[in-house]
Design a protein with these regions (language model features):
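N-terminal phosphate-binding or glycine-rich loops at protein starts, especially the Walker A/P-loop
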Residues: 1-47
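Short, glycine-rich nucleotide/cofactor-binding loops
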Residues: 8-20, 147-157, 275-282
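Glycine-rich phosphate/diphosphate-binding loop of Rossmann-like nucleotide-binding domains
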Residues: 33, 37-39, 44-45, 149-215, ...
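Flexible, glycine/charged-enriched surface loops at secondary-structure junctions
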Residues: 35-37, 171-178, 206-218, 258, ...
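Phosphate/nucleotide-donor binding subsite
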Residues: 56-98
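Glycine-rich phosphate-binding loop
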Residues: 92-111, 185-189, 194-261
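Glycine-rich phosphate/nucleotide-binding loop
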Residues: 115-142, 223-323
Protein backbone atom coordinates (compact mmCIF):
# COMPACT_ATOMS: atom_id res chain seq x y z
CA UNK A 1 0.00 0.00 0.00
CA UNK A 2 1.31 3.42 -0.93
CA UNK A 3 1.69 6.01 1.83
CA UNK A 4 -0.19 9.28 2.01
CA UNK A 5 -3.63 10.44 3.03
CA UNK A 6 -6.37 10.04 0.42
CA UNK A 7 -9.80 11.64 0.87
CA UNK A 8 -12.39 9.77 -1.19
CA UNK A 9 -15.98 10.93 -1.73
CA UNK A 10 -18.27 7.89 -1.97
CA UNK A 11 -21.70 7.97 -3.61
CA UNK A 12 -23.78 5.97 -1.12
CA UNK A 13 -26.79 5.67 -3.42
CA UNK A 14 -25.00 4.56 -6.60
CA UNK A 15 -25.55 1.00 -7.83
CA UNK A 16 -28.18 -1.71 -8.19
CA UNK A 17 -27.95 -2.80 -4.55
CA UNK A 18 -27.09 0.51 -2.93
CA UNK A 19 -26.76 1.54 -0.21
CA UNK A 20 -26.07 -1.87 1.41
CA UNK A 21 -23.18 -2.96 -0.83
CA UNK A 22 -21.67 0.53 -0.86
CA UNK A 23 -21.66 0.63 2.94
CA UNK A 24 -20.08 -2.85 2.98
CA UNK A 25 -17.40 -1.76 0.52
CA UNK A 26 -16.66 1.44 2.39
CA UNK A 27 -16.22 -0.51 5.64
CA UNK A 28 -13.81 -2.92 3.96
CA UNK A 29 -11.81 -0.06 2.47
CA UNK A 30 -11.59 1.81 5.78
CA UNK A 31 -10.32 -1.24 7.63
CA UNK A 32 -7.74 -2.05 4.95
CA UNK A 33 -6.19 1.42 4.62
CA UNK A 34 -5.23 3.40 7.75
CA UNK A 35 -4.52 6.52 5.67
CA UNK A 36 -7.91 6.54 3.98
CA UNK A 37 -10.47 9.24 4.77
CA UNK A 38 -14.02 8.95 3.43
CA UNK A 39 -16.63 11.58 2.66
CA UNK A 40 -19.93 9.71 2.60
CA UNK A 41 -22.44 11.37 0.29
CA UNK A 42 -26.00 10.22 0.85
CA UNK A 43 -28.77 9.98 3.46
CA UNK A 44 -27.51 10.74 6.96
CA UNK A 45 -29.11 7.63 8.45
CA UNK A 46 -27.23 5.40 5.99
CA UNK A 47 -23.94 7.10 6.77
CA UNK A 48 -24.61 6.86 10.51
CA UNK A 49 -25.09 3.11 10.18
CA UNK A 50 -21.66 2.77 8.58
CA UNK A 51 -19.97 5.00 11.12
CA UNK A 52 -21.52 3.03 13.96
CA UNK A 53 -19.76 -0.12 12.73
CA UNK A 54 -16.32 1.50 12.97
CA UNK A 55 -14.09 1.75 16.00
CA UNK A 56 -13.46 5.23 17.49
CA UNK A 57 -10.10 5.65 15.73
CA UNK A 58 -11.65 4.88 12.35
CA UNK A 59 -14.65 7.14 12.92
CA UNK A 60 -12.54 10.28 12.97
CA UNK A 61 -11.60 9.50 9.36
CA UNK A 62 -15.21 9.70 8.16
CA UNK A 63 -17.31 12.77 7.39
CA UNK A 64 -20.81 13.00 5.95
CA UNK A 65 -22.49 15.19 3.33
CA UNK A 66 -26.25 14.57 3.64
CA UNK A 67 -27.93 14.22 0.22
CA UNK A 68 -31.12 12.29 -0.46
CA UNK A 69 -31.57 12.49 -4.24
CA UNK A 70 -30.11 9.73 -6.41
CA UNK A 71 -29.79 9.14 -10.15
CA UNK A 72 -31.50 5.85 -11.01
CA UNK A 73 -29.79 3.29 -13.22
CA UNK A 74 -32.50 3.80 -15.86
CA UNK A 75 -32.49 7.60 -15.67
CA UNK A 76 -31.15 9.76 -18.48
CA UNK A 77 -27.67 11.19 -17.77
CA UNK A 78 -29.15 14.69 -17.69
CA UNK A 79 -30.47 13.76 -14.24
CA UNK A 80 -26.90 14.24 -13.02
CA UNK A 81 -27.42 17.98 -13.42
CA UNK A 82 -29.80 17.92 -10.45
CA UNK A 83 -28.89 17.84 -6.77
CA UNK A 84 -27.95 14.16 -6.71
CA UNK A 85 -25.47 12.17 -4.66
CA UNK A 86 -23.06 11.70 -7.57
CA UNK A 87 -23.10 15.40 -8.42
CA UNK A 88 -22.55 16.32 -4.75
CA UNK A 89 -19.60 13.91 -4.58
CA UNK A 90 -18.08 15.47 -7.70
CA UNK A 91 -18.62 18.95 -6.26
CA UNK A 92 -16.68 17.92 -3.16
CA UNK A 93 -13.68 17.13 -5.36
CA UNK A 94 -14.06 20.38 -7.26
CA UNK A 95 -14.16 22.34 -4.00
CA UNK A 96 -11.09 20.59 -2.57
CA UNK A 97 -13.03 18.79 0.17
CA UNK A 98 -12.21 15.38 -1.35
CA UNK A 99 -9.38 14.13 -3.57
CA UNK A 100 -11.38 11.64 -5.65
CA UNK A 101 -14.90 10.33 -6.19
CA UNK A 102 -16.17 6.75 -6.43
CA UNK A 103 -19.63 5.78 -7.69
CA UNK A 104 -21.33 2.55 -8.75
CA UNK A 105 -24.24 4.51 -10.19
CA UNK A 106 -25.28 4.86 -13.81
CA UNK A 107 -22.19 5.32 -15.96
CA UNK A 108 -23.69 8.02 -18.15
CA UNK A 109 -24.77 10.05 -15.12
CA UNK A 110 -21.36 9.74 -13.47
CA UNK A 111 -19.50 10.75 -16.63
CA UNK A 112 -21.86 13.67 -17.14
CA UNK A 113 -21.57 14.82 -13.53
CA UNK A 114 -17.77 14.65 -13.70
CA UNK A 115 -17.53 16.49 -17.02
CA UNK A 116 -19.92 19.23 -15.89
CA UNK A 117 -18.60 19.54 -12.35
CA UNK A 118 -14.86 19.20 -12.95
CA UNK A 119 -14.49 20.22 -16.58
CA UNK A 120 -12.78 18.34 -19.37
CA UNK A 121 -9.15 18.43 -20.38
CA UNK A 122 -8.31 20.50 -23.46
CA UNK A 123 -8.46 18.49 -26.70
CA UNK A 124 -10.60 15.73 -25.11
CA UNK A 125 -14.06 15.71 -26.65
CA UNK A 126 -15.19 12.59 -24.83
CA UNK A 127 -13.73 11.23 -21.57
CA UNK A 128 -12.76 7.55 -21.57
CA UNK A 129 -13.32 4.81 -19.02
CA UNK A 130 -10.20 2.71 -18.54
CA UNK A 131 -10.14 -0.82 -17.12
CA UNK A 132 -7.10 -2.95 -16.38
CA UNK A 133 -7.58 -6.60 -17.35
CA UNK A 134 -5.53 -9.58 -16.16
CA UNK A 135 -3.80 -11.45 -18.98
CA UNK A 136 -1.40 -14.35 -19.22
CA UNK A 137 1.59 -12.11 -20.00
CA UNK A 138 0.61 -9.30 -17.63
CA UNK A 139 -2.04 -6.61 -17.24
CA UNK A 140 -3.71 -5.07 -20.30
CA UNK A 141 -5.21 -1.58 -20.21
CA UNK A 142 -8.48 -1.47 -22.16
CA UNK A 143 -10.26 1.71 -23.17
CA UNK A 144 -12.90 2.83 -23.73
CA UNK A 145 -15.22 0.60 -21.67
CA UNK A 146 -18.27 2.84 -21.67
CA UNK A 147 -17.44 6.53 -21.60
CA UNK A 148 -18.00 7.27 -25.30
CA UNK A 149 -20.07 4.69 -27.15
CA UNK A 150 -19.74 6.03 -30.71
CA UNK A 151 -16.49 8.01 -31.02
CA UNK A 152 -14.88 9.32 -34.18
CA UNK A 153 -11.39 8.31 -35.36
CA UNK A 154 -9.67 11.32 -33.76
CA UNK A 155 -11.21 10.42 -30.40
CA UNK A 156 -9.76 6.91 -30.65
CA UNK A 157 -6.34 8.43 -31.28
CA UNK A 158 -6.65 10.70 -28.24
CA UNK A 159 -7.77 7.72 -26.19
CA UNK A 160 -4.68 5.81 -27.32
CA UNK A 161 -2.52 8.60 -25.90
CA UNK A 162 -4.59 8.58 -22.70
CA UNK A 163 -4.28 4.82 -22.32
CA UNK A 164 -0.55 4.84 -22.99
CA UNK A 165 0.08 7.51 -20.36
CA UNK A 166 -2.21 5.73 -17.90
CA UNK A 167 -0.44 2.38 -18.34
CA UNK A 168 2.92 4.03 -17.70
CA UNK A 169 1.88 6.26 -14.79
CA UNK A 170 -0.67 4.07 -12.96
CA UNK A 171 0.86 0.65 -13.63
CA UNK A 172 4.53 1.34 -14.35
CA UNK A 173 4.46 -0.21 -17.83
CA UNK A 174 7.65 0.71 -19.69
CA UNK A 175 7.35 1.52 -23.41
CA UNK A 176 3.75 0.30 -23.73
CA UNK A 177 2.62 -1.48 -26.88
CA UNK A 178 -0.66 -0.09 -28.23
CA UNK A 179 -3.17 -1.98 -30.37
CA UNK A 180 -6.53 -1.15 -31.98
CA UNK A 181 -9.20 -3.82 -31.42
CA UNK A 182 -10.63 -5.19 -34.66
CA UNK A 183 -11.84 -8.38 -36.34
CA UNK A 184 -8.45 -9.22 -37.83
CA UNK A 185 -4.84 -8.10 -37.69
CA UNK A 186 -4.36 -7.38 -41.40
CA UNK A 187 -4.36 -3.75 -42.51
CA UNK A 188 -7.77 -2.70 -43.79
CA UNK A 189 -9.70 -5.09 -41.56
CA UNK A 190 -12.66 -3.77 -39.59
CA UNK A 191 -15.38 -1.18 -40.01
CA UNK A 192 -14.94 2.36 -41.28
CA UNK A 193 -13.96 3.64 -37.82
CA UNK A 194 -11.09 1.15 -37.53
CA UNK A 195 -9.95 1.57 -41.12
CA UNK A 196 -9.75 5.34 -40.62
CA UNK A 197 -8.18 5.26 -37.15
CA UNK A 198 -5.51 2.64 -37.97
CA UNK A 199 -3.25 4.85 -40.15
CA UNK A 200 -3.78 7.79 -37.78
CA UNK A 201 -2.54 5.73 -34.87
CA UNK A 202 0.44 4.55 -36.89
CA UNK A 203 1.45 8.17 -37.48
CA UNK A 204 0.90 9.77 -34.06
CA UNK A 205 3.80 9.96 -31.56
CA UNK A 206 2.92 8.24 -28.28
CA UNK A 207 4.30 9.13 -24.82
CA UNK A 208 6.68 7.05 -22.70
CA UNK A 209 8.37 5.46 -25.71
CA UNK A 210 5.18 3.61 -26.63
CA UNK A 211 4.70 2.13 -30.08
CA UNK A 212 1.64 1.25 -32.09
CA UNK A 213 1.58 -2.45 -33.04
CA UNK A 214 -1.47 -2.27 -35.32
CA UNK A 215 -4.75 -4.15 -35.20
CA UNK A 216 -5.30 -6.75 -32.49
CA UNK A 217 -8.06 -9.27 -31.84
CA UNK A 218 -9.97 -10.35 -28.76
CA UNK A 219 -7.68 -13.24 -27.90
CA UNK A 220 -4.71 -10.86 -27.88
CA UNK A 221 -6.30 -9.21 -24.84
CA UNK A 222 -6.54 -12.54 -23.03
CA UNK A 223 -2.91 -13.40 -23.75
CA UNK A 224 -1.41 -9.93 -23.34
CA UNK A 225 1.41 -10.97 -25.65
CA UNK A 226 0.87 -8.34 -28.39
CA UNK A 227 -0.32 -5.20 -26.64
CA UNK A 228 -0.26 -3.58 -23.22
CA UNK A 229 -2.92 -1.02 -24.20
CA UNK A 230 -5.93 -1.86 -26.38
CA UNK A 231 -8.12 0.90 -27.79
CA UNK A 232 -11.73 0.51 -28.91
CA UNK A 233 -15.06 2.32 -28.82
CA UNK A 234 -16.98 2.39 -25.55
CA UNK A 235 -19.79 0.14 -26.78
CA UNK A 236 -17.47 -2.69 -27.86
CA UNK A 237 -15.25 -2.22 -24.82
CA UNK A 238 -18.14 -2.43 -22.37
CA UNK A 239 -19.56 -5.57 -24.00
CA UNK A 240 -16.09 -7.15 -24.02
CA UNK A 241 -15.46 -6.27 -20.38
CA UNK A 242 -18.71 -7.86 -19.23
CA UNK A 243 -18.10 -10.94 -21.38
CA UNK A 244 -14.68 -11.35 -19.77
CA UNK A 245 -16.20 -10.98 -16.31
CA UNK A 246 -18.71 -13.71 -17.15
CA UNK A 247 -16.03 -16.00 -18.54
CA UNK A 248 -13.93 -15.63 -15.38
CA UNK A 249 -16.97 -16.46 -13.25
CA UNK A 250 -17.62 -19.64 -15.26
CA UNK A 251 -13.95 -20.65 -15.26
CA UNK A 252 -13.53 -20.22 -11.53
CA UNK A 253 -11.38 -17.10 -11.63
CA UNK A 254 -9.00 -14.96 -13.69
CA UNK A 255 -5.36 -15.74 -14.55
CA UNK A 256 -2.85 -15.70 -11.72
CA UNK A 257 -1.48 -12.40 -13.06
CA UNK A 258 -4.38 -10.40 -11.64
CA UNK A 259 -7.96 -10.20 -10.47
CA UNK A 260 -11.20 -9.40 -12.24
CA UNK A 261 -11.44 -5.68 -13.09
CA UNK A 262 -13.82 -4.25 -10.52
CA UNK A 263 -13.64 -0.56 -11.34
CA UNK A 264 -12.67 1.78 -14.16
CA UNK A 265 -10.90 5.13 -14.04
CA UNK A 266 -12.40 8.05 -15.94
CA UNK A 267 -9.76 9.92 -17.95
CA UNK A 268 -10.34 13.26 -19.61
CA UNK A 269 -11.82 15.23 -16.70
CA UNK A 270 -9.99 17.51 -14.28
CA UNK A 271 -10.14 15.21 -11.28
CA UNK A 272 -9.83 11.61 -10.12
CA UNK A 273 -13.04 9.69 -10.79
CA UNK A 274 -13.59 5.94 -10.47
CA UNK A 275 -16.69 4.13 -11.72
CA UNK A 276 -17.71 0.73 -10.34
CA UNK A 277 -20.05 -1.71 -12.06
CA UNK A 278 -23.72 -1.11 -11.31
CA UNK A 279 -23.97 -4.70 -10.05
CA UNK A 280 -20.96 -4.22 -7.79
CA UNK A 281 -20.65 -6.16 -4.55
CA UNK A 282 -18.99 -4.92 -1.39
CA UNK A 283 -15.53 -6.11 -2.39
CA UNK A 284 -15.94 -4.44 -5.79
CA UNK A 285 -16.73 -1.10 -4.15
CA UNK A 286 -13.76 -1.54 -1.81
CA UNK A 287 -11.54 -2.18 -4.84
CA UNK A 288 -12.90 0.97 -6.50
CA UNK A 289 -12.08 3.03 -3.42
CA UNK A 290 -8.60 1.50 -3.30
CA UNK A 291 -8.07 2.32 -6.99
CA UNK A 292 -9.13 5.93 -6.43
CA UNK A 293 -6.71 6.23 -3.51
CA UNK A 294 -3.91 4.66 -5.59
CA UNK A 295 -4.47 7.06 -8.49
CA UNK A 296 -4.58 10.06 -6.18
CA UNK A 297 -1.41 9.09 -4.34
CA UNK A 298 0.40 8.72 -7.65
CA UNK A 299 -1.09 11.99 -8.92
CA UNK A 300 -1.97 9.92 -11.96
CA UNK A 301 -4.67 12.21 -13.31
CA UNK A 302 -2.43 15.28 -13.21
CA UNK A 303 0.48 13.43 -14.81
CA UNK A 304 -1.61 11.91 -17.61
CA UNK A 305 -3.15 15.33 -18.31
CA UNK A 306 0.31 16.92 -18.56
CA UNK A 307 1.49 14.22 -20.97
CA UNK A 308 -1.60 14.74 -23.11
CA UNK A 309 -0.96 18.49 -23.26
CA UNK A 310 2.49 17.81 -24.73
CA UNK A 311 1.25 15.26 -27.27
CA UNK A 312 0.71 16.40 -30.90
CA UNK A 313 -2.89 17.04 -31.85
CA UNK A 314 -4.58 14.79 -34.41
CA UNK A 315 -6.05 16.63 -37.40
CA UNK A 316 -9.81 16.33 -37.73
CA UNK A 317 -11.06 13.82 -40.27
CA UNK A 318 -14.09 14.10 -42.56
CA UNK A 319 -17.16 13.29 -40.50
CA UNK A 320 -15.19 13.56 -37.26
CA UNK A 321 -16.33 17.06 -36.32
CA UNK A 322 -18.63 15.59 -33.68
CA UNK A 323 -18.80 12.18 -32.05
CA UNK A 324 -22.30 10.75 -31.99
CA UNK A 325 -24.20 11.19 -28.74
CA UNK A 326 -26.01 8.09 -27.48
CA UNK A 327 -28.63 7.44 -24.84
CA UNK A 328 -25.95 7.06 -22.16
CA UNK A 329 -24.36 10.40 -22.97
CA UNK A 330 -25.37 14.03 -23.20
CA UNK A 331 -23.93 16.84 -25.25
CA UNK A 332 -21.56 18.82 -23.06
Amino acid sequence: MEPGTARIAVDLLGGDDAPAVVVDGALRAMRADPDLHLLLVGPAEVADGLIGALDPVQRIRVTVRPVRAAVGMADHPVAARADSTVRAAVTAVRDGIADAVVSAGATGATVTAAALGLGRWPHVRRPALVATLPAVAGPVVLLDVGGSLEPGPATLVRHAVLGTAYAAVAHGVAEPRVGLLSVGTEAGKGDRLRRTADPLLAAVPLPHGARYVGLVEGYDIASGSRADVVVTDGFTGNVLLKAIEGAYAMAGGPPASGGVPRAAALLGVAGTVVVCHGAARGDDVASGIALAAHLWRRRATETVSALLDRAPQTPSQPGDHADRTTDTEVSL
